[in-house]
Amino acid sequence: MNKYTINDITRASGGFAMLAVDQREAMRMMFAAAGAPAPVADSVLTDFKVNAAKALSPYASAILVDQQFCYRQVVEQNAIAKSCAMIVAADEFIPGNGIPVDSVVIDRKINPLQIKQDGGKALKLLVLWRSDEDAQQRLDMVKEFNELCHSHGLVSIIEPVVRPPRRGDKFDREQAIIDAAKELGDSGADLYKVEMPLYGKGPQQELLCASQRLNDHINMPWVILSSGVDEKLFPRAVRVAMTAGASGFLAGRAVWASVVGLPDNELMLRDVCAPKLQQLGDIVDEMMAKRR
């Protein structure tokens, strides 16, 4: 059996410059906020995701797609550049309490063999981390996910995202990110996708210290995501995180959020977003070169 490794989703430099287009109801809300006619149709999301894959995958080492809105269409339309690997989201988002993702389970409809036949090289699992929920349940889900990936020769990517506890109102996001890393940073996955400390804000030295604390607890290669980070601050965030030990990024919003809801999205993705992604890829290569 052909077994993929993280080297199959990196750039030649060994760094990760990966694009996420697997946002689901959150993306629908972004379109609604941008003034798209309500209710925002599934086809609006699918078209945007497929167009993003076509316009941006030449500049990404991998692209993360979701089953619900775009996996089949992306495969059928050959939307992903040959130089770019496909990652498929293996998480099912369960809405509740007024938010689009209140809990997450492994998507039982996932077919790893089919994904591999379609050119997929990795699966991704979102893990919501709350201090007052059962750690063992999270660890068990990650273990099952890792086995699902590795038994089919696919790369396992976990994405712990911290949330306020179910009960009580005390929430220290920064400490929660560290606590999640302590719990899941040595869980047997191949790659750890993490929220940027401090939302990428503040003095560089503070950001670096926070990122180094994170690095101390993650015993696998790790990359940052861009949700919650101002897109103008994201290139610096990539530099700082990589100085601390990260190996790149897997990000969506910092690349394409500014064109959601604009006309001519194919053109916008090509003219506005592609240069951003190219610049981020250059930063990854530059930071990897410093390690040699």
From Swiss-Prot:
Taxonomy, superkingdom: Bacteria
Residues annotated as catalytic: K193 (schiff-base intermediate with substrate)
Matches recorded under Pfam families: DeoC (PF01791)
Enzyme class per UniProt: lyase
EC number: 4.1.2.57
TM segment ranges: none
UniProt cross-references to SMART domains, sorted A to Z: DeoC
HAMAP family: SFP_aldolase
Protein name as it appears in the record: Sulfofructosephosphate aldolase
Organism this protein belongs to: Escherichia coli (strain K12)
